[in-house]
Amino acid sequence: MRSRKLALALVSALTTMAVGLGAQAANAVFPDFTGCTATNIATEGCIDIQNRSANFNIKGFNVPLGESLEIRGTLTSDGAGGLLFTPPRGTNGFFARAVPVPGGIFGIEWLPGNTVLAITELAGSPSQIKINTNDLSVRIPIKVRLVNLLLGMDCHIGTNSNPVNLNLITGTTSPPPPNTPISGRVGALRLFERGIIFTGNVNVENSFAVPGATECGLGLGLINSLVNLRLRLPSAAGNNSMAIVNDVALGTP
């Protein structure tokens, strides 16, 4: 019993650490166009993408992401048929909550000091977020911060220079083996007073690679190998997948 109480206390401490990182938290309000700077509705608009459930799978190791992710900002025509993403002031437009990694470091849920929280982060600049409003696909480079008293505050899977590159589509994928094609879909469309909402979209991706861990263990990489062993990293393209159920709102401020 004492070990379980200690485990709960450590979870609380880790959550406080995660908040202290300054991670931009996903919003429960939908749609949320806070920070959208669109003024010319002919060439600009607001977007809010919030996930309802998600799974990130690395060689069979599954991490449920829950309702932890959001992309929010302004879309502007680039004059060549594409769209430029601008985040709300003071943010990068990508918002995430910390989620627990099943089994923690050692694969034993209740073991004191074992709990690991994962925070998905944008890897690089907001300009690298590419959104297609025709098919609701999203291209985005990410990295995942792992937070644990042993791992330290700088442990990451992926970096700005070597990210996990996701192309989340609503169509059918064409992955390298051993993965096989999977399909997403565009959800139901409805109107609201400031625009349109698509609910229940499914975006999928299973052609990406996942690099090994970096800076785990006091920021010195002392236990990168332990993290890689636990999460089966690095993992080549064709062994990983991500599926997200989300709602998308497009409109005016």
Predicted regions and their residues:
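Secretory targeting and sorting signals
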Residues: M1-A28
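Extracytosolic secretory-pathway proteins
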Residues: N27-P253
